[in-house]
Protein backbone atom coordinates (compact mmCIF):
# COMPACT_ATOMS: atom_id res chain seq x y z
CA UNK A 1 0.00 0.00 0.00
CA UNK A 2 2.18 2.84 -1.31
CA UNK A 3 -0.11 5.57 0.05
CA UNK A 4 1.16 4.75 3.54
CA UNK A 5 4.63 6.07 2.77
CA UNK A 6 3.27 9.13 1.02
CA UNK A 7 1.37 9.96 4.18
CA UNK A 8 4.44 9.32 6.30
CA UNK A 9 6.43 11.99 4.52
CA UNK A 10 3.66 14.57 4.70
CA UNK A 11 2.63 14.01 8.30
CA UNK A 12 6.08 13.48 9.81
CA UNK A 13 8.55 16.21 8.76
CA UNK A 14 11.56 14.36 10.16
CA UNK A 15 10.90 11.33 7.96
CA UNK A 16 10.50 13.65 5.00
CA UNK A 17 13.78 15.39 5.80
CA UNK A 18 15.91 12.25 5.73
CA UNK A 19 14.47 11.10 2.41
CA UNK A 20 13.55 7.48 3.02
CA UNK A 21 14.39 5.36 0.00
CA UNK A 22 12.68 2.17 -1.09
CA UNK A 23 15.44 -0.19 -2.22
CA UNK A 24 13.58 -3.43 -2.66
CA UNK A 25 14.21 -6.36 -0.37
CA UNK A 26 17.88 -7.21 -0.62
CA UNK A 27 20.13 -9.06 1.78
CA UNK A 28 23.23 -6.88 1.33
CA UNK A 29 24.09 -3.53 -0.14
CA UNK A 30 27.35 -1.87 -1.09
CA UNK A 31 28.92 1.42 -0.01
CA UNK A 32 31.94 3.06 -1.58
CA UNK A 33 34.67 5.56 -0.76
CA UNK A 34 36.35 7.24 -3.71
CA UNK A 35 39.75 8.92 -3.92
CA UNK A 36 42.10 10.37 -6.50
CA UNK A 37 42.13 13.42 -8.75
CA UNK A 38 42.16 14.14 -12.44
CA UNK A 39 45.59 15.56 -13.35
CA UNK A 40 46.35 18.42 -15.73
CA UNK A 41 49.21 17.98 -18.23
CA UNK A 42 50.56 18.88 -21.64
CA UNK A 43 48.83 17.91 -24.87
CA UNK A 44 50.28 14.62 -26.14
CA UNK A 45 51.53 13.91 -22.61
CA UNK A 46 50.92 10.68 -20.73
CA UNK A 47 47.67 9.89 -19.01
CA UNK A 48 47.90 10.44 -15.26
CA UNK A 49 45.66 10.58 -12.24
CA UNK A 50 44.48 7.26 -10.93
CA UNK A 51 40.99 7.19 -9.47
CA UNK A 52 40.39 4.63 -6.76
CA UNK A 53 37.20 3.27 -5.27
CA UNK A 54 36.96 1.11 -2.19
CA UNK A 55 33.77 -0.91 -1.88
CA UNK A 56 32.50 -2.36 1.35
CA UNK A 57 29.62 -4.70 2.03
CA UNK A 58 27.22 -3.31 4.59
CA UNK A 59 25.03 -5.33 6.91
CA UNK A 60 21.78 -6.68 5.59
CA UNK A 61 18.43 -4.92 5.66
CA UNK A 62 17.28 -7.22 8.40
CA UNK A 63 15.21 -5.11 10.79
CA UNK A 64 11.54 -6.04 10.59
CA UNK A 65 8.81 -3.70 11.75
CA UNK A 66 5.47 -5.34 12.46
CA UNK A 67 2.01 -4.40 13.65
CA UNK A 68 -1.44 -5.95 13.68
CA UNK A 69 -4.99 -4.72 14.03
CA UNK A 70 -7.98 -6.80 15.09
CA UNK A 71 -11.37 -5.36 14.14
CA UNK A 72 -14.91 -6.71 14.61
CA UNK A 73 -16.32 -8.52 11.60
CA UNK A 74 -19.49 -6.46 12.05
CA UNK A 75 -17.57 -3.43 10.76
CA UNK A 76 -17.85 -4.89 7.27
CA UNK A 77 -21.48 -3.82 7.36
CA UNK A 78 -20.19 -0.26 6.97
CA UNK A 79 -18.41 -1.23 3.74
CA UNK A 80 -15.07 -2.94 3.01
CA UNK A 81 -13.52 0.30 1.69
CA UNK A 82 -14.15 2.06 4.98
CA UNK A 83 -12.71 -0.86 6.95
CA UNK A 84 -9.54 -0.86 4.84
CA UNK A 85 -9.08 2.87 5.36
CA UNK A 86 -9.57 2.44 9.10
CA UNK A 87 -6.91 -0.28 9.23
CA UNK A 88 -4.48 1.59 6.98
CA UNK A 89 -4.78 4.73 9.11
CA UNK A 90 -3.90 2.85 12.27
CA UNK A 91 -0.97 1.03 10.68
CA UNK A 92 0.21 4.23 9.02
CA UNK A 93 0.56 6.05 12.32
CA UNK A 94 2.07 3.07 14.13
CA UNK A 95 4.74 2.63 11.46
CA UNK A 96 5.43 6.37 11.28
CA UNK A 97 6.01 6.62 15.02
CA UNK A 98 8.17 3.49 15.11
CA UNK A 99 10.34 4.57 12.17
CA UNK A 100 10.81 8.09 13.51
CA UNK A 101 11.76 6.77 16.93
CA UNK A 102 14.25 4.26 15.52
CA UNK A 103 15.90 6.69 13.09
CA UNK A 104 16.41 9.19 15.94
CA UNK A 105 17.11 7.18 19.09
CA UNK A 106 17.27 3.53 17.93
CA UNK A 107 20.05 1.56 19.63
CA UNK A 108 20.68 -0.79 16.69
CA UNK A 109 19.50 -3.97 18.41
CA UNK A 110 16.92 -5.46 16.04
CA UNK A 111 16.18 -1.92 14.90
CA UNK A 112 17.91 0.91 12.98
CA UNK A 113 20.82 2.84 14.50
CA UNK A 114 19.54 6.30 15.39
CA UNK A 115 21.19 9.68 14.97
CA UNK A 116 22.00 9.79 18.69
CA UNK A 117 24.25 6.70 18.53
CA UNK A 118 27.98 6.46 17.90
CA UNK A 119 28.85 4.83 14.58
CA UNK A 120 32.48 5.85 14.11
CA UNK A 121 35.27 3.41 13.38
CA UNK A 122 36.26 1.49 16.48
CA UNK A 123 32.88 1.95 18.16
CA UNK A 124 32.34 -0.76 20.76
CA UNK A 125 29.03 -2.44 19.91
CA UNK A 126 27.82 -4.71 22.73
CA UNK A 127 25.18 -7.33 21.93
CA UNK A 128 24.06 -5.30 18.93
CA UNK A 129 23.64 -2.08 20.94
CA UNK A 130 25.50 1.03 19.79
CA UNK A 131 26.61 3.46 22.54
CA UNK A 132 25.02 6.89 22.85
CA UNK A 133 26.80 10.00 21.66
CA UNK A 134 27.94 12.48 24.28
CA UNK A 135 27.07 16.15 23.88
CA UNK A 136 29.63 17.85 21.65
CA UNK A 137 28.70 21.39 22.66
CA UNK A 138 26.02 23.76 23.89
CA UNK A 139 23.61 25.94 21.94
CA UNK A 140 22.31 28.94 23.88
CA UNK A 141 21.00 31.25 21.11
CA UNK A 142 21.72 33.97 23.67
CA UNK A 143 22.21 36.77 21.16
CA UNK A 144 22.62 37.27 17.43
CA UNK A 145 26.41 37.29 17.64
CA UNK A 146 26.54 34.30 19.98
CA UNK A 147 24.14 32.37 17.74
CA UNK A 148 26.28 32.98 14.66
CA UNK A 149 29.36 31.71 16.49
CA UNK A 150 27.56 28.66 17.86
CA UNK A 151 26.05 27.68 14.53
CA UNK A 152 29.36 28.26 12.77
CA UNK A 153 30.87 25.58 15.00
CA UNK A 154 28.00 23.23 14.13
CA UNK A 155 28.46 23.71 10.39
CA UNK A 156 32.24 23.37 10.64
CA UNK A 157 31.83 20.08 12.52
CA UNK A 158 29.63 18.61 9.80
CA UNK A 159 31.72 20.01 6.93
CA UNK A 160 34.44 17.38 7.41
CA UNK A 161 33.78 13.66 7.13
CA UNK A 162 35.16 11.21 9.66
CA UNK A 163 37.90 10.28 7.18
CA UNK A 164 39.01 13.91 6.98
CA UNK A 165 37.51 14.74 3.60
CA UNK A 166 35.80 18.15 3.33
CA UNK A 167 32.09 18.31 2.56
CA UNK A 168 29.84 21.16 1.39
CA UNK A 169 26.98 21.35 3.90
CA UNK A 170 25.61 24.80 3.03
CA UNK A 171 21.84 24.57 3.36
CA UNK A 172 22.10 20.90 4.34
CA UNK A 173 22.17 21.02 8.16
CA UNK A 174 19.00 20.43 10.17
CA UNK A 175 18.48 20.95 13.88
CA UNK A 176 16.10 18.46 15.48
CA UNK A 177 14.53 19.64 18.74
CA UNK A 178 11.71 18.90 21.11
CA UNK A 179 8.55 20.89 20.22
CA UNK A 180 8.74 22.74 23.55
CA UNK A 181 12.27 23.98 22.91
CA UNK A 182 11.49 24.96 19.32
CA UNK A 183 9.30 27.81 20.50
CA UNK A 184 12.11 29.31 22.57
CA UNK A 185 14.29 29.51 19.47
CA UNK A 186 11.49 30.83 17.26
CA UNK A 187 10.65 33.52 19.80
CA UNK A 188 14.24 34.74 19.77
CA UNK A 189 14.44 35.01 15.98
CA UNK A 190 10.97 36.10 14.92
CA UNK A 191 10.53 39.74 13.94
CA UNK A 192 8.19 42.04 12.02
CA UNK A 193 9.50 42.98 8.58
CA UNK A 194 8.84 46.13 6.54
CA UNK A 195 5.77 44.56 4.95
CA UNK A 196 4.13 43.98 8.31
CA UNK A 197 4.72 40.23 8.19
CA UNK A 198 6.30 38.24 10.99
CA UNK A 199 9.25 36.17 9.77
CA UNK A 200 11.54 33.72 11.52
CA UNK A 201 15.13 33.64 10.26
CA UNK A 202 18.23 31.91 11.57
CA UNK A 203 21.82 32.20 10.34
CA UNK A 204 22.87 30.03 7.37
CA UNK A 205 19.22 29.10 6.66
CA UNK A 206 19.31 26.51 9.42
CA UNK A 207 16.28 24.25 9.22
CA UNK A 208 14.56 23.39 12.51
CA UNK A 209 12.39 20.28 12.76
CA UNK A 210 10.46 19.15 15.81
CA UNK A 211 10.13 15.63 17.17
CA UNK A 212 8.74 14.26 20.40
CA UNK A 213 11.58 11.73 20.45
CA UNK A 214 14.17 14.42 21.18
CA UNK A 215 14.47 14.95 24.96
CA UNK A 216 13.78 18.46 26.24
CA UNK A 217 16.82 20.75 26.43
CA UNK A 218 18.65 18.61 23.88
CA UNK A 219 19.18 19.14 20.17
CA UNK A 220 20.44 16.91 17.37
CA UNK A 221 22.16 18.43 14.35
CA UNK A 222 22.49 16.28 11.26
CA UNK A 223 23.13 16.28 7.52
CA UNK A 224 20.12 14.44 6.11
CA UNK A 225 21.83 13.12 2.99
CA UNK A 226 24.44 11.43 5.19
CA UNK A 227 21.94 9.17 6.95
CA UNK A 228 20.89 5.98 5.16
CA UNK A 229 17.17 5.41 5.76
CA UNK A 230 16.23 2.47 3.58
CA UNK A 231 12.94 0.64 3.23
CA UNK A 232 13.26 -2.93 2.00
CA UNK A 233 10.46 -4.01 -0.28
CA UNK A 234 6.80 -3.07 -0.29
CA UNK A 235 4.70 -2.90 2.84
CA UNK A 236 2.88 -6.18 3.29
CA UNK A 237 -0.59 -6.24 4.86
CA UNK A 238 -2.20 -9.66 5.22
CA UNK A 239 -5.78 -10.40 6.23
CA UNK A 240 -6.78 -13.40 8.36
CA UNK A 241 -10.51 -13.93 8.77
CA UNK A 242 -10.38 -17.26 10.64
CA UNK A 243 -7.58 -16.75 13.19
CA UNK A 244 -9.90 -15.00 15.65
CA UNK A 245 -13.14 -16.53 14.40
CA UNK A 246 -14.48 -17.32 17.87
CA UNK A 247 -13.91 -13.70 18.88
CA UNK A 248 -15.75 -12.62 15.70
CA UNK A 249 -12.74 -10.54 14.64
CA UNK A 250 -10.75 -10.05 11.45
CA UNK A 251 -6.99 -9.82 11.88
CA UNK A 252 -4.83 -7.52 9.74
CA UNK A 253 -1.07 -8.05 10.08
CA UNK A 254 1.52 -5.71 8.55
CA UNK A 255 5.28 -5.95 8.21
CA UNK A 256 8.02 -3.83 6.72
CA UNK A 257 11.79 -4.25 6.48
CA UNK A 258 13.96 -1.23 7.21
CA UNK A 259 17.57 -0.14 7.69
CA UNK A 260 18.89 3.06 9.20
CA UNK A 261 22.41 4.20 10.05
CA UNK A 262 24.52 7.33 9.66
CA UNK A 263 27.32 7.14 7.10
CA UNK A 264 29.90 8.10 9.73
CA UNK A 265 30.33 9.77 13.12
CA UNK A 266 30.29 13.30 11.67
CA UNK A 267 26.86 12.94 10.05
CA UNK A 268 25.11 13.84 13.32
CA UNK A 269 25.89 15.46 16.64
CA UNK A 270 24.10 15.86 19.96
Predicted regions and their residues:
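Helix N-cap / beta->alpha transition motif
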Residues: 1, 72, 176-181, 223, ...
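Active-site and NAD+-binding cores of ADP-ribose-processing enzymes
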Residues: 50, 100, 218
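Short conserved micro-motifs at the rims of enzyme active sites and ligand-binding pockets
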Residues: 40-43, 81, 186-190, 218-221, ...
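Alpha-helical scaffold segments that mediate packing/assembly in large oligomeric complexes
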Residues: 56-154, 270
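Extended oligomerization regions of viral-like shell subunits
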Residues: 117-246, 250, 256
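Low-complexity, Gly/Ser/Thr/Pro-rich intrinsically disordered linker/tail segments
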Residues: 248, 269-270
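Assembly/oligomerization interface modules of large self-assembling protein complexes
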Residues: 1-68
Amino acid sequence: VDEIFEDLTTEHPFLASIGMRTTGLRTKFLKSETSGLAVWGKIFGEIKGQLDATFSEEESIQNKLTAFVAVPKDLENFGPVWVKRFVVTQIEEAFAVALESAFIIGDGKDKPVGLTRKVGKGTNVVDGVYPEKVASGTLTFASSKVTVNELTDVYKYHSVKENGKPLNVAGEVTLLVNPTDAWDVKKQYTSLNANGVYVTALPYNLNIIESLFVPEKKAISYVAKRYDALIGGALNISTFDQTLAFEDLNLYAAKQFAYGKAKDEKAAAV
